[in-house]
């Protein structure tokens, strides 16, 4: 059965964070998930990769056609969810649509922040994880290599990433809405990954009163804090120290909330109801959503920031048209490569058949020479034998055919045997 490229999953436009966090896969769970996927479908899934970020969880597969119908059930079962509840949020792309989707994702056209560059690195990490899991083959390897090339071309030839309003910059603006200038604000960053580093960079530019980094691994917190002359603290100290901070930005890989309603409620009482801005960029969420109901807390999720970011994308809309044109050209190029792969086995078989004929006729010629026959007669017989053997198949097909089939075969003769006019 033929193998098709398939892209399947959900993202920030198809599913709210409450759904995305339930199918999000930390890096250490990607390999077991790929193994489970291939074990479930056996040889029907030839190759696979999983891209899981705050804004999307997607599967890219080289698979037989019937696999697509069963992927929603697999994803639901893998995450212990009801398929009926998950299905409305899922999308599926096949063939050139799947290739187009991969190119758009890597180029930042499908991102919550139009043109944001982080997604390309995240996709490269996903490909690396799939390769380490032994789940990549020729087709997906070629797809992703072309995907990275297209993303680079789009960014170098268009203004898609120019003046990008980042999530980190938006987080600063939200804090400024509540506190005005941030010179007196005490800021806490929970986590030490790329997003926290970006946020810390933007907040540091506003010269807040203090910056503290809390992380499960204190060494990573110290490395990040050292860049901004910030302090560090242990996650275990959050309960006692949370009330100190005016702005909290959190983005960890925790599968469970770090800040619960009770903890934050106690902190607001200790602060005598001075406001707190809490920005949760994690998926799954680090802060229980019920915290947003507290009068003195301004809680923003990654989806809230995404909606605010969209207002800053108008200046880049013109670049989208140019980017889409580049992508469309490259999609057609990839599909041509895929189609050319289909004839490779046929070409290989033709070469083998021709080589078998050559070897047989050559051996016959050697025997004739060994019997003392003249070289001229041997060459004549060799040429005649090769001609007869090579033409036997086409001539037999023509003789057996009739009607439309014969007309089609006759039309192909000049293309298969160029240099001679067809005589009918």
UniProtKB/Swiss-Prot annotation:
Q: Does the keyword Chaperone apply?
A: no
Query: Which reaction equations make up its catalytic activity?
Result: (S)-4-amino-5-oxopentanoate + tRNA(Glu) + NADP(+) = L-glutamyl-tRNA(Glu) + NADPH + H(+)
Q: Which residues form the active site?
A: 54 (nucleophile)
| CDD domains hit by this protein | NAD_bind_Glutamyl_tRNA_reduct
| MF term (GO), any | NADP binding
Amino acids binding NADP(+): 191-196
Q: Which UniProt keyword terms apply here?
A: NADP, Oxidoreductase, Porphyrin biosynthesis
- EC number of the protein: 1.2.1.70
Q: Anything noted about its domains?
A: Possesses an unusual extended V-shaped dimeric structure with each monomer consisting of three distinct domains arranged along a curved 'spinal' alpha-helix. The N-terminal catalytic domain specifically recognizes the glutamate moiety of the substrate. The second domain is the NADPH-binding domain, and the third C-terminal domain is responsible for dimerization.
Task: Give the similarity note.
Answer: Belongs to the glutamyl-tRNA reductase family.
Give the note.
During catalysis, the active site Cys acts as a nucleophile attacking the alpha-carbonyl group of tRNA-bound glutamate with the formation of a thioester intermediate between enzyme and glutamate, and the concomitant release of tRNA(Glu). The thioester intermediate is finally reduced by direct hydride transfer from NADPH, to form the product GSA.
Q: What does this protein do?
A: Catalyzes the NADPH-dependent reduction of glutamyl-tRNA(Glu) to glutamate 1-semialdehyde (GSA).
Q: What is this protein called?
A: Glutamyl-tRNA reductase
């Amino acid at each position: 059965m033929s193998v098709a490229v398939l892209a399947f999953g959900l993202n920030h436009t198809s599913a709210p964070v409450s759904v995305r966090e339930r199918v999000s896969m930390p890096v250490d769970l990607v390999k077991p998930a790929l193994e489970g996927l291939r074990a479930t479908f056996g040889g029907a899934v030839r190759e696979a990769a999983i891209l899981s970020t705050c804004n999307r969880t997607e599967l890219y597969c080289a698979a037989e056609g019937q696999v697509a119908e069963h992927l929603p059930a697999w994803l639901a079962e893998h995450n212990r969810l009801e398929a009926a509840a998950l299905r409305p949020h899922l999308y599926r792309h096949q063939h050139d649509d799947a290739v187009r989707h991969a190119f758009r994702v890597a180029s930042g056209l499908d991102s919550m922040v139009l043109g944001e560059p982080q997604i390309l690195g995240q996709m490269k990490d996903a490909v690396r994880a799939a390769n380490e899991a032994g789940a990549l083959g020729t087709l997906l390897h070629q797809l992703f290599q072309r995907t990275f090339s297209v993303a680079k071309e789009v960014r170098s030839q268009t203004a898609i990433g120019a003046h990008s309003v980042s999530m980190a910059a938006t987080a600063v603006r939200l804090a400024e809405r509540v506190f005005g200038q941030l010179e007196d604000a005490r800021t806490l960053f929970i986590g030490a990954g790329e997003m926290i580093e970006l946020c810390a960079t933007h907040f540091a530019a506003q010269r807040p009163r203090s910056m503290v980094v809390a992380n499960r691994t204190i060494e990573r917190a110290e490395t990040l804090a050292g860049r901004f002359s910030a302090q560090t603290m242990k996650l275990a100290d959050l309960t006692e120290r949370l009330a100190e901070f005016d702005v909290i930005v959190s983005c960890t890989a925790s599968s469970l909330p770090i800040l619960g309603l009770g903890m934050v409620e106690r902190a607001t009482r200790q602060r005598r109801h001075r406001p707190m801005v809490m920005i949760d960029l994690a998926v799954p969420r680090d802060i229980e959503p019920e915290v947003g109901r507290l009068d003195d807390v301004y809680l923003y999720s990654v989806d809230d920031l995404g909606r605010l970011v969209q207002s800053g994308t108008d200046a880049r809309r013109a670049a989208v048209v140019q980017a889409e044109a580049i992508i469309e050209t490259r999609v057609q190029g990839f599909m041509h490569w895929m189609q050319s792969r289909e004839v490779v086995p046929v070409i290989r078989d033709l070469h083998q058949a021709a080589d078998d004929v050559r070897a047989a006729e050559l051996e016959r010629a050697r025997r004739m020479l060994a019997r003392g026959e003249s070289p001229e007669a041997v060459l004549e017989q060799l040429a005649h034998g090769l001609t007869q053997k090579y033409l036997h198949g086409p001539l037999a097909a023509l003789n057996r055919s009739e009607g439309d089939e014969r007309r089609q075969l006759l039309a192909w003769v000049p293309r298969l045997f160029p240099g001679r006019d067809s005589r009918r």
